[in-house]
């Protein structure tokens, strides 16, 4: 049951990842990244109350949703909510940094992933032990709540303060906005002159295939150890 619940997350993620990034391009990073963070936090907190949610669903005639199926449903929605966050952040960085600068900031972003695991493990253990029984909730329930609430709050902050693109940055001087946007536009024009490949051509490229196999191995190892 647990393994299926873990795996169904990726179905939601896979289905909605590309549409999510396309929507981000249309509505702007500020709105869409904030939406991802807020919905992620809300659903993460909801895992603490699976039995209660199951009871509500059954009370309105959806008797199919016992605790296990409610857990599966939340995991699928959780994947759909998170879909697009990682590529969305990478896309957002292209709005602000040239290719030469971008590698450094992508590295900083990627470094946060293992750092969160280093900090999150001991912190999770502390929450499980110290919060157990508070307000009638078990430690594992508090773990989901404490995980979800900061994401919601940070999402609200992102919605209020994140700036989509340099031309909209009121905190930059006018000449700084113009200079930065000009550099980015020049790089974009040079990229447009490069031949673009179709999806089929990319999938036939030996380097793409090799990197896909390597990345699949990395992700499989990470999630295998995590779960």
How should these model regions be labeled?
Residues 200-227:
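Extracytoplasmic gate region of multi-pass secondary transporters
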């Amino acid at each position: 049951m647990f393994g299926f619940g873990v795996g169904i997350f990726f179905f939601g993620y896979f289905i909605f990842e590309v549409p999510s990034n396309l929507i981000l391009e249309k509505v702007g990073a500020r709105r869409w990244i904030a939406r991802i963070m807020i919905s992620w936090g809300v659903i993460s907190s909801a895992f603490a109350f699976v039995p209660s949610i199951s009871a509500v669903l059954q009370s309105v005639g959806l008797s199919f949703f016992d605790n296990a199926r409610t857990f599966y449903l939340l995991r699928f929605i959780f994947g759909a909510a998170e879909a697009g966050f990682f590529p969305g952040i990478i896309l957002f960085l292209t709005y602000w940094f040239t290719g030469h600068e971008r590698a450094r900031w992508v590295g900083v972003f990627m470094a946060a992933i293992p750092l969160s695991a280093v900090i999150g493990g001991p912190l999770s253990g502390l929450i499980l032990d110290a919060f157990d029984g508070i307000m009638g909730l078990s430690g594992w329930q508090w773990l989901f709540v404490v995980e979800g609430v900061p994401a919601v709050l940070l999402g609200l902050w992102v919605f209020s303060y994140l700036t989509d693109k340099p031309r909209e940055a009121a905190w930059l001087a006018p000449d700084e906005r113009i200079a930065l946007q000009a550099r980015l536009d020049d790089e974009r024009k040079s990229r447009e002159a490069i031949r673009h490949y179709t999806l089929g051509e990319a999938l036939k490229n030996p380097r793409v295939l090799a990197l896909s196999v390597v990345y699949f191995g990395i992700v499989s190892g990470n999630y295998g150890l995590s779960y």
